[in-house]
UniProtKB/Swiss-Prot annotation:
Primary location: membrane
Organism lineage string: Eukaryota, Metazoa, Ecdysozoa, Nematoda, Chromadorea
Tissue specificity field: Expressed in coelomocytes.
One cellular component (GO) term of this entry: postsynapse
UniProt keyword annotations, A-Z: Cytoplasmic vesicle, Disulfide bond, Endocytosis, Glycoprotein, Ion channel, Ion transport, Ligand-gated ion channel, Membrane, Receptor, Signal, Transmembrane, Transmembrane helix, Transport
Paired cysteines (S-S): C178-C192
GO molecular function: acetylcholine receptor activity; excitatory extracellular ligand-gated monoatomic ion channel activity; monoatomic ion channel activity; transmitter-gated monoatomic ion channel activity involved in regulation of postsynaptic membrane potential
InterPro entries in alphabetical order: Neur_chan_lig-bd, Neur_chan_lig-bd_sf, Neur_channel, Neurotransmitter_ion_chnl_CS
Annotated transmembrane regions: 282-302, 307-327, 337-357, 413-433
Name of the gene: cup-4
Name under which the protein is recorded: Acetylcholine receptor-like protein cup-4
UniProt-listed SUPFAM superfamilies: Nicotinic receptor ligand binding domain-like
Length: 433
């Protein structure tokens, strides 16, 4: 009797429960109703297409991707610069590269289990919401639409269950106006900045530098990855900073209250610092100036005035050639004349005055004109000349009227020594300071 009761208990209670457990394990794609073959034979593109249909169903790219509109959208930005071109005549700088932008979207969400565990989706730029950014100092104007590429791809990554990370990496080619100062040519140091801003106030969109990382520079590959010299300039540093525009002013202090957020726009400034690269300046400019200055001084120690006059004319012609070659490379936009140009100008004036002086002495000696009484006082210097040099400037004491030749023998060496000292001082001031 007990055996019959035990068998009936098993038939009534245990077997239905076991059958129900087996049926529950066979539900899904492995069950009789599931289509496992169709699920596993789907290609990756088919899963992506189904995923895009799901996440973009009812999605509006014009709406900011925040379910709570009182919270702003934080956009992280990083610059990857691959080339910098500086036009010193137009006072412009053109920067090429990629700009990385990242933010979180609370509407582009999905369950990866429903799409073969896909965590990433690659879509087009126009399909998702994106911050509207402009360059305030663009040479093309504030409303230019050609600073950033419009064909960039977007990567969406699921982050948890309630939001997705959106990454965009468009290329850019930005030309901005600058205010260069080449007064210290060829040792001039200049800076130029690109000012990026969002058209929405900080109550909606806030731009910030990604982890405060400075812009990445890639001017070359492999052995040229440390390249920093482009054309006539050497890039010294590229930095980024956060700025804020409010009430017509730009400040580095972030707004505090919510009211201030509604009247403030976030800006990101990328500043490029560069110095002129002119390795041939000493050989092409300084050395000729030293040679010309030496020859000018030497003319005061040549006895023949006619030879001196011809040499001075040759100096003047050579200086014009050097000046033409220098001015051809000199930037037109300068606030003050560079010291090297001042030095060449001083040399030309010195050459001209020396030419006039020697011409006057030559004319006086040729026509044998008497020396003016005022110039006779110069012969007092003879008493202070060392005995070593007196033979060259010896003048007969019994002569009451001195000749121009006597005057030349006295003052030309003195002027030569004084000129050498002055030229050395000018070279020190103009080229070394």
């Amino acid at each position: 009797m007990k055996i019959i009761i035990f068998v009936c208990f098993i038939l009534i209670f245990y077997l239905p429960i076991q059958k129900k457990h087996v049926n529950s394990q066979q539900q899904g794609i492995d069950s009789d109703d599931g289509d496992a073959e169709s699920f596993f034979n789907k290609s990756y593109s088919e899963h992506q297409s189904a995923l895009e249909q799901k996440i973009f169903r009812g999605y509006n790219p014009k709406n900011r991707p925040m379910k709570n509109a009182s919270f702003p959208t934080i956009v992280d930005v990083h610059w990857h610069i691959i080339h910098v071109s500086i036009n010193q005549r137009e006072q412009t700088m053109t920067v090429h590269g990629h700009i990385y932008m990242r933010w979180f979207d609370e509407f582009l969400v999905w369950d990866p289990k429903d799409f073969n565990n896909i965590q990433y989706a690659r879509v087009k730029k126009w399909q998702v919401w994106q911050p509207k950014i402009k360059v305030s100092n663009s040479a093309s104007g504030l409303g230019s639409a050609f600073d950033f590429s419009t064909s960039a791809h977007v990567i969406i990554q699921m982050m948890g269950k309630d939001r997705a990370k959106v990454e965009m990496y468009p290329t850019f080619s930005i030309k901005v106006g600058c205010a260069f100062d080449f007064t210290d040519y060829p040792y001039d140091l200049n800076k130029c900045a690109i000012n990026l801003f969002s058209t929405s106030t900080m109550a909606d969109v806030q731009l910030q530098n990604l982890y405060a990382i400075p812009p990445t520079l890639s001017f070359g590959w492999e052995e040229q990855k440390m390249k920093r010299i482009i054309s006539d300039f050497k890039i010294q540093n590229v930095s980024s900073s956060a700025l804020y525009y409010t009430n017509g002013n730009i400040t580095s202090s972030a707004p505090i209250t919510g009211f201030d957020l509604g009247s403030t726009w976030s800006m990101l400034a990328v500043t490029v610092s560069f110095v002129r690269h002119s390795p041939l300046f000493e050989a092409a400019v300084v050395t000729p100036c030293i040679v010309v200055a030496s020859l000018i001084s030497m003319t005061f120690f040549i006895d023949s005035l006619s030879s001196t006059f011809l040499l001075m004319m040759l100096h003047f012609y050579v200086q014009l050639i050097f000046l033409h070659d220098l001015v051809e490379k000199l930037p037109l936009s300068v606030s003050e004349i560079p010291f090297c140009i001042k030095l060449i100008g001083i040399l030309m004036y010195t050459n001209g005055l020396t030419l006039v002086l020697h011409s006057s002495l030559l004319c006086g000696s040729y026509y044998k004109c008497p020396v003016p009484q005022q110039l006779n006082k110069i012969f007092v210097i003879e008493e202070y000349i060392p005995n070593t040099f007196k033979e060259k400037v010896q003048i007969k004491k019994e002569e009451s009227n001195k000749s121009w030749r006597d005057l030349m023998k006295l003052i030309r060496p003195i002027i030569g020594f004084v000129l050498i000292i002055l030229l050395i001082c000018m070279f020190f001031v103009c080229l070394l300071l």
